[in-house]
């Protein structure tokens, strides 16, 4: 994903300027990568209610348990709110309470498949 612009820039006033602007952001095919975003809603099996943050089966316990697979916690006021891995992946909490794997930039779909399967076996 490209970084957001740091200034408003000059307004585009022709089709050619638009084409040149888009072309300037293109990477050569050798640098192309794909990444996975995989969201999971965490809920309690017996009540089907969303899992709380605290508790034996809560989001905090899930994030802390995943650390045994090499995930490093991202803390806010001492509480884990995300995880990062040396391989370029991260696990984040989304606004709706879901847990998201943001995969590493990989070369092909078979690598993303392996990444998701590994993640799901850890969860």
Where are these regions (language model features)?
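Terminal catalytic/cofactor-binding subdomain
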Residues: 1-123
């Amino acid at each position: 994903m490209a970084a957001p612009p740091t200034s408003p820039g000059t307004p585009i006033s022709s089709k050619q300027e638009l084409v040149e602007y888009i072309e300037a952001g293109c990477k050569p095919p050798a640098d192309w990568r794909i990444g996975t975003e995989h969201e999971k809603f965490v809920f309690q099996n017996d009540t089907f209610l969303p899992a709380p943050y605290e508790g034996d089966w809560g989001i905090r316990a899930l994030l802390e348990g995943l650390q045994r697979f090499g995930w490093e916690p991202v803390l806010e006021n001492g509480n884990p709110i995300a995880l990062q891995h040396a391989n370029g992946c991260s696990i984040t909490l989304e606004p709706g309470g879901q847990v998201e794997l943001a995969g590493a930039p990989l070369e092909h779909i078979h690598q993303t498949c392996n990444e998701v399967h590994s993640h799901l076996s850890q969860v």
